[in-house]
Amino acid sequence: MDYKPAMAHSSPNIVICGAGIAGVAAAYALTVDHGVDNVVMVEPGIPLSLTSDKSTEAYRNWWPGPDRAMTAFMDRSIDLIEDIARATDNRINLNRRGYVFATSDAGKIPFLRDMAKMAEARGGGAARFHDTPSSLYTPSPEHGFDFAFTGADVFTDTSLIRRYFPYLSPTTVAVAHARRAGWLSAQQLGAVMLEAVRARGVKIVKGRVVGIDAGTRVRAVEVARDGERLMLAADHVVLAGGPMQSEMARMIGLDLPITAERHFKVSFPDTLGGLPRSAPMLIWLDEQHLPWSEEERAALAEDEEARWLFGTFPAGVHGRPDGASATIILYNHHGDAVDPVFPLPEQEHYAEIALRGMSTMVPALQAYGGKPTRPYIDGGYYMRTRENRPLIGPVPVEGAYISCAYSGFGIMASRAGGELIARHITGTELPDYADAFLLSRYQDAEYRAMLENWGDDGQL
């Protein structure tokens, strides 16, 4: 990809604390989109390696909430990601296979219908309902992203479900296929942006942020590097610390309303072809008891510490095919707030729980007997606010900005999040959704009241 330099102009020193996807996207928007120079990123490790590469790499514009802010924000981010895909001959392997939400509970049919109608009202595209065997439906293509359909298709005719999604559990009674959704290579998206910012002269200082010189405004960032302390002059500081964001924010006297939730994913070679290579992202909406054989149940019953595996597991197990033969599954069945620590503690039985949970939705995966072949587990932390909306923009300390709380949607939101930070810093026109992501929203009494009745926060 050839990066045409934007019109450069004299600009203040900008230090971005963190070179995960949020920090790199901010640097990209500042330098490539706005022509800003004098940008430095500070990162203690390898850029994009702490948690940015530990996701399902998926995206969607299907978001609940009391207004259209998240849908508009994600639509903008997807637009910008598609621009990168077009400019690089789709080096980032972007597809638009969609997200399929499925249930075996007829009581959830009104929920799926309402979600589709709400998404339509929020600007997410038309809701289409398929209640008879003759209803017309156009499947999403396996490859590419220039696909006209948006919105969602809601199926309640089981013969149609069997025709178009034959791999789903025969107990499935309803499906919603959100269409402006799919996945990409997060590694390649990050690499494209990182290459571009380096070409624009952005320097990456390897070190740990240990202090920020700020009274009423920021002046410098203190970095510990190779046993020495380095002071980086700064007129603007962007805190994009991912799991370390709370620690960084306290350096300027901020106590951010964010918590950390641990998440994992398992990838394994699907040698038995349990999940078809053409499948979309699949999400099971029902609570469940994991499927165990009688022999397994008897063995587990004898182990007091393993009896919790007989309990009720939450809705939300989801997975997708990955490349020619692998399958990825996420099942975040423990959502408690924790303090981020690295390396990530191991989660007992995770691969088996995830595979068994997913096999409830896709019975062909039961062929593995709950034992995936050569499973690879990684994970990270979802840094999130109570209502699961990000924090993007200026804070009370002049010259300081935050780009954080991207929860499980950091990859898909990265381009719009970076653009929003760049617009705040450069003083250019802000989009309508900008106020929805400011830290100052929590000072608004009406917003605080809305938090008490927020409803679905959209986290998978």
Residue ranges and their predicted role:
Residues 72-75, 102-109, 176-195, 343-352, ...:
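Short beta-strand to alpha-helix junction loop
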Residues 227-299:
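Central helical "cap/lid" subdomain
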Residues 169-171, 175-236, 240-243:
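Helical element adjacent to the flavin cofactor pocket in flavoenzyme catalytic cores
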Residues 271-398:
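Active-site lid/adjacent beta-loop-alpha segment flanking the redox-cofactor pocket in flavoenzymes
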Residues 147-163, 337, 348-415, 419-425, ...:
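Flavin (FAD/FMN) cofactor-binding core of flavoprotein oxidoreductases
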Residues 31-53:
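Glycine-rich FAD pyrophosphate-binding loop
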Residues 6-22, 40:
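Beta1/beta-strand and adjacent pyrophosphate-binding region of the FAD-binding site
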